[in-house]
């Protein structure tokens, strides 16, 4: 039995992860309460105006494009993750043991999966936050609300915080769970050697998470630079 079998070691991490998810839920409800483009551009009768409609239309196009992009990207990344997991299994099976090989490859896939989940979650919130940040900066004539950059900053900061806490929460949850499972495995050797093997397998989780984050950052940067071919907006557009 590994020397890392104490549940007390991971309890603080589990608690911090749970608090992160609770705070994310609070932020998400706060974001949903912010006005959209249609909400800020209405006449006295409550009919939506052209500017607000255009903001929501552009936001929907960006969101749909982001979903299609992530779907294609994650399809290729799934092949990459499975191929690299198989490679890691083969390398550690040849040099260590089948138990370590399985532990490293499963930890790698787990880290990659949670990292991809955080990226998808962040993209969905970010695309929705774009239009609400624009709406907050535009103000609302119907309710005599002047446009201020501070309102837009508040929305943007709240939206970005969701992604930040999602990364932290999912990371802590994944590392703690992997640590708890790996510490219960029957590795061969003395306590020091067992501890080293546990950390060796746990490193696979970080490797998987970092791999997805690297490709998401590079590919996402390229995607945002692709020319957006659509008819030019009308002169009355914001």
Residue ranges: model-predicted function:
Residues 2-238:
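Hydrophobic, small-residue-rich transmembrane alpha-helices and their short perimembrane loops
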């Amino acid at each position: 039995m590994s020397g890392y079998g104490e549940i007390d070691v991971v309890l603080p991490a589990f608690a911090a992860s749970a608090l992160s998810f609770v705070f994310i839920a609070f932020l998400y409800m706060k974001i949903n309460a912010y006005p959209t483009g249609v909400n800020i551009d209405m006449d006295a009768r409550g009919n939506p105006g052209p500017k607000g409609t255009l903001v929501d239309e552009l936001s929907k196009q960006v969101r749909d494009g982001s979903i299609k992009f992530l779907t294609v990207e994650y399809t290729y990344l799934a092949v990459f993750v499975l191929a690299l997991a198989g490679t890691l299994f083969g390398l550690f099976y040849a040099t260590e043991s089948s138990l370590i090989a399985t532990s490293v490859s499963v930890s790698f896939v787990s880290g990659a999966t949670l990292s991809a989940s955080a990226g998808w979650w962040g993209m969905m919130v970010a695309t929705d936050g774009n239009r609400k940040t624009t709406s907050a900066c535009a103000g609302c004539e119907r309710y005599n609300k002047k446009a201020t950059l501070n309102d837009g900053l508040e929305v943007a900061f709240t939206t970005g915080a969701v992604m930040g806490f999602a990364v932290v929460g999912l990371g802590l949850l994944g590392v703690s769970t992997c640590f708890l499972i790996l510490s219960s495995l029957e590795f061969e050797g003395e306590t020091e050697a067992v501890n080293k093997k546990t950390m060796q397998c746990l490193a696979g989780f970080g490797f998987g998470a970092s791999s997805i984050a690297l490709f998401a950052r590079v590919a996402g940067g390229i995607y945002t630079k692709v020319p957006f071919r659509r008819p030019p907006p009308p002169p009355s557009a914001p």
